[in-house]
């Protein structure tokens, strides 16, 4: 009987081949459709084994004689004949059985011949014969099928022993078959197809061959990814992974025989595997380096697109597969390695044990040569190095060296515990370094020099015994989203005209500074977070000129940005806060541009310019700092323009010890001390600023301070708008000083200066108060609408008053105390309210006019009968009324308030309508100078 009549075989392909032809099955993506499998011819290999070799997809046997296990150009392995229908006595035809599955098999029309399946969808192999061996199919062409013959057929049908075997037993049998036989079995029957494509069978084969415990996805050259079974689109990930990897050769410390793969090749040295692959141009260059420590005789030289990947049954494959060099560089990539791959391997260099035992020899060897764990050199060296652990235990040479325009790609690698530099990139080399960890190296984690320009992204560089990243001698580089921390010296050091880009990195917890730019270093540092460093977050020195933009610099144990030694740079749009010292320091003739920053909540000052520092400081917001918002001292002369300086816990802007510079168009407000303080020889120019809300006045000039204040608005300060005291001599010109809660300008303690063309109005006390031996010059000022006198001169002071206008002041235009003789020329005093004179005329106590908020100037007396002291003063009307008949004496014409009316004497004032308690009287408080010293 023809096998084609059996329902246990699938329909053959159109092409019919000779049964004697030797065939090998091929791999198909659809493991559930045996009719789609094809086969190819096999040539016996040396030693009697069948040799399977890689062939590019789509090539024919004629084009490539090396067609192998998974070729798609083979044919069906059996010679099959066409099926004939079963004839009946009544000349009715049975339905031809055209499908191998029960779902597609129609029922016969005759009861006398019925096919029974063992199970739905299960294919079977049997023949139908009578007792004499005559083929029943032929007999049925002319005779009727009898019941006895039908019973014989059923009895014979029950003899299908193979298909009646338990599935566990078949799985056990299949677990011993090689991949070639498994693929062949998949075309025998549906049941064989299911079992030969089961996960258990292919997983055991896969693990024995590759040692992996997770399927390795290898869709294209130099791309490898371990994927859990649930992430594979194919039905059998183990089988699919084997299809992708079966062309590879294996390197083991102790090569083993594996009979389950027809393509299996195993060597004990990487060099031998490389030589084998170079001889076969059609075979994929793929090497599996298995568990163990592999010690090459000399450097492993890679100048092709070979792929080398670690293979181990350990969860940590990388640490289980070690390539160790001891006499020379362990691994070198040169020209031709543009598409090479190296992954999941530990690479390390250790000195030869003989050299280690003889230190002198080791020292001489190190002086003569540099040794590396991995060396990538020359222009066309562009390997992909992935998930490797790299270290070097010699003091002369980096773990990784990239030079001479090489451009490798390192990804998910570690470079740890090296005795020298971690990664050394030089001589115009580039490359990509992503998701790497570089840590605990004796010298810098990364060296970049000689115009090298690598790309680092999402790397962690930490715990080094030196610098984290060191760029020097025109080195460049792009560092993005790296985490650089806990290095003994700076996180990043830029030197000798190096010019890197550092963007969106974190630089923190350095044992010294965060970023150190010196010796004409440059660089662009943008959108980084720089914090918790022991020294300054960023140091710029010795003619360096970096760009610092949009960074967060905070909680440093010293300052935020420190610029000295004639440093320059652009510091722009940064958020600098919470540092132990000044947010920005500029010293020793440095001249940066500082603009659009927020500098706030520091434990020290905001910006500190000293030791002849300069710089353009504009459009910054400086607030909430413990000490002065901006300090300018020791010969410094910065330009401070359009800044907003506010809410400080001391002074807004503080010039001292020969501090100079230009303070222009700034908003300075709401400080606990003065808005601006000038002292000890400082001589800034302060122009077009708005200064308000100072709790200790607007501007305080003292201790020999100078300065030129022009065109400013000084208003709404708790004390005087401008204080001039202790031998200070500023120039005030064209300012508007108004709405002060004390006087407009107060000049004390030998204060001098020139007040010219100012408008002083609506202040709570005198527009200008001159006292205690002071001698200023007032020229062409307008003092008006004051709630006290326009100008008051008292206590031994004098002044030169020229062409001033004093009008609409409450107590009078000009009030001069006894013994004061100012120089007056061309002043106009008019339309003042003269409230004091009117009160005297109407018999009012002057305290009724002034209360305890101001000090009217008039004749004041003391009463000897009431035992008043020199500190007490009584107005004229109280002497006439309350102390009539007492012994009194004139004190002087001066600024007092009436103690009788204030209720501070034992006698009750008869001129007060209601009793008053002894409120604390008010006097112009002494201005508070900053407690900050001259040293940080």
Curated annotation (Swiss-Prot):
Placement of PbH1 repeats on the sequence: 405-427, 428-450, 451-473, 474-496, 497-519, 520-542, 543-565, 566-588, 589-611, 612-634, 635-657, 658-680, 681-703, 704-726, 727-749, 750-772, 773-795, 796-818
Chief location bin: nucleus
Keywords, comma-separated and alphabetical: Apoptosis, Cytoplasm, Developmental protein, Metal-binding, Nucleus, Repeat, Ubl conjugation pathway, Zinc, Zinc-finger
Reported effect, residue 514 to S: In dh99; failure of distal tip cells to migrate completely back to the midbody, precocious fusion of epidermal seam cells, molting defects, constitutive dauer formation and increased blmp-1 levels
Subcellular location(s) of the protein: Nucleus; Cytoplasm
Zn finger residue spans: UBR-type: 843-914
Recorded phenotype for the gene knockout or disruption: Most mutants arrest as three-fold embryos that fail to hatch and those that hatch arrest in L1 with many animals appearing uncoordinated and misshapen. 7- to 8-fold increase in blmp-1 levels in seam and hypodermal cells.
Transmembrane residue ranges: none
Single biological process term from Gene Ontology: positive regulation of apoptotic process involved in development
The keyword Repeat appears for this protein: yes
Effect on the protein upon substituting residue 902 to V: In dh280; enhances gonadal heterochrony phenotype in daf-12 null mutants
Sequence segments annotated as region (Disordered): 1-67
Pathway where it operates: Protein modification; protein ubiquitination
One MF term in the entry's GO annotations: zinc ion binding
Tissue: In mid-embryogenesis, expression is most prominent in epidermal and intestinal cells. By the 1.5-fold stage of embryogenesis, expression is additionally detected in neurons and other cells. During larval and adult stages, highest expression is seen in epidermal seam cells and hypodermis. In larvae, strongly expressed in the P epidermal blast cells and descendents that give rise to the vulva and weakly expressed in the somatic gonad, including the gonadoblasts, the anchor cell and the distal tip cells. Some weak expression also seen in adult spermatheca and uterus.
PROSITE patterns referenced in this protein's UniProt entry, alphabetically: FBOX, ZF_UBR
Pfam families documented for this protein: Beta_helix (PF13229), F-box-like (PF12937), zf-UBR (PF02207)
Cellular-component GO terms for this entry: cytoplasm; nucleus
Biased composition (Low complexity): 22-36
Domain F-box intervals: 159-205
PANTHER family named among the record's database cross-references: F-BOX ONLY PROTEIN, F-BOX ONLY PROTEIN 11
Described purpose of this protein according to its UniProt entry: Substrate recognition component of a SCF (SKP1-CUL1-F-box protein) E3 ubiquitin-protein ligase complex which mediates the ubiquitination and subsequent proteasomal degradation of target proteins including blmp-1. Promotes ubiquitination of snail family proteins ces-1, scrt-1 and snai-1. Heterochronic protein which is required for the timing of gonad development and epidermal seam cell differentiation. Regulates tail-spike cell death through inhibition of the apoptosis regulator ced-9.
Quaternary data: Component of a SCF ubiquitin ligase complex. Interacts (via F-box) with skr-1. Interacts with blmp-1; the interaction targets blmp-1 for proteasomal degradation. Interacts with ced-9; the interaction inhibits ced-9 activity, either directly or indirectly.
NCBIfam families recorded: para_beta_helix
Name of this protein: F-box protein dre-1
Annotated source species: Caenorhabditis elegans
Biological classification of the source: Eukaryota, Metazoa, Ecdysozoa, Nematoda, Chromadorea
């Amino acid at each position: 009987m023809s096998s084609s009549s059996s329902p246990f075989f699938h329909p053959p392909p159109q092409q019919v081949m000779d049964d004697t032809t030797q065939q090998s099955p091929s791999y198909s993506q659809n493991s559930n459709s045996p009719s789609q499998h094809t086969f190819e011819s096999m040539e016996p290999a040396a030693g009697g084994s069948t040799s399977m070799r890689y062939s590019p997809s789509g090539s024919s046997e004629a084009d490539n004689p090396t067609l192998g296990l998974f070729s798609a150009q083979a044919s069906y392995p059996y010679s099959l004949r066409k099926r004939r229908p079963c004839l009946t006595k009544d000349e009715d035809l049975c339905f031809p059985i055209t499908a191998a599955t029960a779902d597609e098999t129609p029922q016969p029309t005759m009861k006398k011949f019925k096919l029974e399946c063992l199970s739905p969808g299960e294919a079977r192999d049997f023949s139908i014969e009578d007792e004499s061996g005559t083929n029943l199919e032929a007999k049925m062409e002319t005779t009727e099928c009898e019941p006895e013959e039908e019973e014989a057929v059923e009895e014979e049908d029950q003899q299908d022993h193979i298909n009646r075997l338990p599935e566990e037993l078949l799985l056990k049998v299949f677990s011993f078959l090689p991949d070639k036989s498994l693929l062949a079995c998949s075309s025998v029957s549906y049941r064989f197809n299911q079992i030969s494509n089961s996960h258990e069978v292919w997983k055991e084969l896969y693990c024995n061959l590759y040692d992996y415990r997770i399927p390795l996805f290898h869709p294209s050259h130099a791309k490898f990814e371990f994927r859990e079974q649930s992430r594979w689109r194919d039905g059998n990930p183990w089988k699919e992974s084997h299809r992708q990897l079966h062309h590879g050769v294996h390197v083991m410390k102790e090569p083993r025989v594996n009979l389950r793969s027809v393509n299996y090749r195993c060597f004990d040295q990487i060099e031998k595997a490389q030589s084998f692959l170079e001889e076969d141009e059609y075979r994929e260059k793929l090497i599996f380096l298995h568990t163990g420590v592999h010690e090459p005789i000399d450097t492993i030289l890679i100048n092709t697109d070979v792929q080398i990947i670690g293979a181990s049954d350990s969860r940590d494959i990388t640490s289980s597969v070690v390539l160790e060099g001891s006499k020379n560089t362990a691994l070198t990539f040169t020209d031709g390695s543009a598409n090479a791959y190296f992954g999941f391997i530990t690479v390390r260099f250790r000195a030869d044990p003989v050299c280690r035992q003889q230190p002198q020899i080791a020292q001489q060897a190190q002086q003569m040569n540099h040794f590396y764990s991995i060396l990538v050199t020359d222009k066309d060296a562009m390997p992909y190095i992935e998930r490797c652990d790299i270290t070097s235990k010699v003091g002369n040479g980096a773990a990784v060296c990239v030079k001479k325009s090489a451009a490798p790609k390192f990804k998910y690698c570690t470079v740890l515990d090296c005795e020298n530099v971690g990664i050394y990139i030089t001589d115009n080399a580039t490359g990509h370094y992503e998701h790497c960890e570089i840590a605990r190296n004796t010298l810098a984690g990364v060296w970049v020099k000689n115009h090298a320009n690598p790309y680092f992204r999402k790397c962690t560089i930490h715990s080094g015994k030196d610098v984290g990243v060191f760029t020097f001698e025109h080195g460049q580089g792009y560092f993005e989203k790296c985490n650089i921390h806990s290095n003994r010296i700076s996180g990043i050091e830029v030197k000798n005209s190096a010019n890197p880009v550092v963007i969106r990195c974190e630089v923190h917890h350095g044992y010294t500074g965060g970023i150190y730019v010196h010796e004409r270093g440059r660089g662009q540092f943008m959108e980084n977070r720089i914090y918790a460093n022991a020294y300054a977050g960023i140091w710029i020195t010795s003619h360096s000129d970096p760009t610092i933009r949009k960074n967060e610099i905070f909680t440093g144990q010293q300052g935020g940005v420190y610029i000295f030694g004639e440093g320059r740079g652009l510091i722009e749009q940064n958020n600098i806060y919470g540092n132990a010292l000044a947010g920005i320091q500029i010293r020793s003739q440095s001249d940066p541009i500082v603009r659009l920053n927020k500098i706030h909540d520091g434990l020290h000052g905001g910006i500190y310019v000293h030791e002849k520092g300069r710089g353009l400081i504009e459009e910054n917001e400086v607030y909430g700092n413990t000490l002065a918002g901006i300090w300018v001292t020791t010969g410094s002369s910065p330009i401070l323009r359009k800044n907003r300086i506010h809410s400080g816990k001391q002074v807004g802007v503080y010039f001292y010890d020969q501090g100079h510079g230009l303070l222009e168009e700034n908003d300075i407000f709401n400080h606990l001390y003065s808005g601006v303080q000038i002292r000890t020889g400082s001589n800034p120019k302060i122009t077009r600023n708005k200064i308000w809300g100072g709790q200790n006045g607007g501007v305080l000039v003292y201790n020999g301070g100078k300065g030129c204040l022009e065109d400013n608005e000084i208003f709404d300060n708790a004390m005087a708008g401008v204080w001039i005291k202790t031998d200070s001599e500023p120039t005030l010109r064209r300012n508007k000083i108004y709405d002060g809660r004390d006087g407009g300008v107060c000049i004390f303690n030998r204060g001098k200066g020139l007040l010219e063309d100012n408008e002083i109005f609506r202040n709570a006390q005198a527009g200008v108060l001159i006292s205690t031996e002071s001698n200023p010059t007032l020229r062409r000022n307008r003092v008006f609408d004051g709630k006290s006198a326009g100008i008051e001169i008292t206590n031994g002071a004098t002044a030169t008053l020229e062409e001033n206008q004093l009008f609409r002041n409450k107590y009078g235009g000009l009030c001069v105390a006894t013994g004061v003789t100012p120089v007056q020329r061309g002043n106009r005093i008019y339309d003042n309210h003269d409230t004091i004179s009117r009160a005297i005329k109407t018999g009012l106590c002057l305290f009724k006019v002034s209360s305890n908020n101001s000090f009217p100037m008039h004749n004041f007396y003391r009463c000897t009968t009431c035992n008043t002291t020199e500190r007490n003063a009584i107005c004229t009307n109280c002497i006439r009324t309350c102390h009539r008949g007492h012994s009194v004496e004139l004190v002087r014409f001066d600024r007092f308030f009436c103690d009788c009316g204030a209720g501070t004497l034992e006698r009750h004032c008869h001129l007060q309508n209601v009793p008053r308690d002894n409120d604390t009287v008010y006097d112009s408080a002494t201005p508070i100078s900053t407690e900050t010293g001259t040293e940080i």
